[in-house]
Design a protein with these regions (language model features):
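Non-catalytic, C-terminal membrane-associated alpha-helical segments of glycosyltransferases
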Residues: 256-263
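Nucleotide-sugar donor-binding/catalytic module of glycosyltransferases
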Residues: 2-240, 244-249
Length: 263
């Protein structure tokens, strides 16, 4: 029986990686190289073609045909924005953990192995790593040592106040699915209330103090091209959603900070 359990565990996907793609044909091969070179092999990669008008969808299909055991593609019936595209990927994901990547960015080949191994040490619900932003020439780690381990209200507040980016983290997939946590469609700041909702539901967190994610800031990417999304009502919608979260637990001051960030 123990042998069978070990065998089944070996077959399980450890990390699902969801990648929204919008008119990113010139970045797809580089993105694929980053993923194929990952040292963690028990991964599934879910590309979501978010209504691209270039050859992105065709290129993704070609790669999925070449590497069907790792890659799959979802073709959205409409332009949902990076948040909506990620939601389609979340629904399809089967891994123990889930991570997100933007097609035009770069990840270290050891990123998902290091994040997963850290998560497996003590069953952490969320693990973060440091990132480097090419445009600003700055690096940062959102989840510092002061807010790792088992979470209390003080640590939760610190996470919410400096929540960072979804792409530098992996999350226990069951936390997202069991609590029906989703990302807002077609708005800017789509990460913000998503990450705050997760912070309110996870029990513990950890970090890997290495720069494993390179943020490229390409203007035409799915996450950076506003495609008419930069509107006042978008920010207002996220602001109101964050305001409602303050009733979930004792993190009111952190929620106020997050709302200021949104503005």
């Amino acid at each position: 029986m123990a042998i069978l359990i070990n065998y089944m565990e070996e077959l399980m996907v450890k990390v699902s990686i969801v990648i929204p793609v919008y008119n990113a044909e010139k970045y797809i091969d580089r993105c694929v190289d980053c993923l194929l070179n990952q040292t963690l092999k028990d991964i599934e990669v879910i590309f979501v073609d978010d209504g691209s008008t270039d050859n992105s969808g065709l290129l993704l299909e070609q790669w999925c045909n070449k590497v069907p055991d790792i890659f799959q593609v979802i073709h959205s019936d409409r332009d949902r924005g990076p948040g909506g595209a990620r939601n389609l990927g979340i629904a399809k994901a089967t891994g123990s953990y889930i991570g997100f990547m933007d097609c035009d960015d770069i990840i270290d080949r050891t990123m998902y192995e290091k994040l997963y191994n850290k998560a497996a040490e003590a069953g952490y619900d969320m693990v973060d790593c440091a990132y480097y932003n090419e445009l600003s020439d700055e690096s940062a780690l959102a989840i510092g040592d002061n807010i790792t381990g088992k979470l209390d209200d003080a640590k939760r507040s610190d996470i919410i106040a400096g929540v960072g980016y979804a792409v530098t983290k992996i999350f226990r997939l069951s936390v997202i699915k069991d609590n029906n946590i989703r990302i807002r469609e077609n708005v800017i700041y789509e990460d913000l209330d998503f990450l705050i909702n997760i912070a309110l539901k996870i029990n513990n967190t950890a970090n890997v103090k290495e720069i494993l994610y390179i943020y490229k800031n390409n203007d035409n990417s799915a996450s950076h091209n506003n495609r008419e999304q930069i509107k006042f009502n978008d920010m207002l919608a996220v602001y109101k959603a964050i305001d409602r979260l303050k009733y979930d637990c004792n993190v009111d001051e952190a929620i106020k900070y997050a709302k200021i960030t949104c503005i």
